[in-house]
Amino acid sequence: MDLTCTDSIYLCILSSTGEILEQVFGVLTTQLEEMRDLMLKYNVQEVGMESTSVYWIPVWRVLESHFELKLINPYFIKQLPGRKSDVKDAQWIAECMMKELVRGSFVPPERIQQLRLYDRRIYDLDDEIIRKLAKLDAVIQRCNIRLSNYVSNTDSVSYKSVIDKICEGVTSPEELVKEVHGRIINRHGKETIIASLKGCITEVDIDIMTQLKAEIDLAELHKQKCLEKKQDICEREYSEQLSNLQTIPVVKMKAATSLIAEIGTDMSHFETANHLSSWAGLRPRNDQSNKIIKSRRITHGNRYLRRTIIQCAWGASRAKDYFFCRFSYYQTQVRKKNRMKVIVAISRKMLVCAWLILKENVAYKDFDNKILTSDTKG
């Protein structure tokens, strides 16, 4: 079937004898149920559909319990130019399915899909908070308050305390400096900090700051609720796997729940750890022609999983007494490798560890030092 982004689903039923049945259905639930009943009437066994944004999800939910479904990457079933239409797309998908030319994408169980919704909502809220903080800092800079030049970041306690006071209507530098941490004052001098807090603040600026601060607080509240819900589900249904994942160096509750949300706990979907690494986009692409390697950049993959595991890799590269730290030192200082490439290599190793932990249901065991000299590829 070919799913469109508007209000139509093009169904093509292809039998082993070559008979073709084509029909167009709407996207409402009752219309999807009519389509399901028609497919049951014709004894359909396998169903293939393109992964079109999020439009495949409602169709999947209606058909999941009745058919063997395959979610197909559109990249693998591209049509020839000049032969492109919704009906022909449906025919082409049916033909590829019958001849077993395509494989289905990984679609986790319903509970893991629910965890994914929380996990990706958290990432969206993180990005939203960063954008709002940047806008808030722009308003502060417009008022010529230069405190951000002297604090570590715009999410620091001192910076937020000063913003809170300004939103309350306090604009005197002598009063605002009381909210700044003593270490910052000692480092840069009290007079310098007071001068950085002296600006031209209007009522409109205070109003906009108050609105932005309220939006940031709301986003942080929603983020905290999502974190609690995700953690509650994992502790209730995947407690053993959650505990085992947290034995990996620097992998704590947030990262462990994100790993479960993205890859699930059943590793039968990934035949080997290399399959999982490839799916996450942590392997070099195969771009070679006439014995010339054109590119070895990592591939596109699950960006949420890759983001989580790379963040963990940065921490693991600094975690003393563990293999990942020794590996990072050996590759960057002894072999003079690029640090970012080493981080990608560490993240791949950590993902392999996660695959083995979930597959064997065991805790993490650190690598031997001898691996450092034998494993030169990273």
Regions found by a protein language model. Give the residues of each.
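A detector of single, family-specific signature residues
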Residues: M1-G378
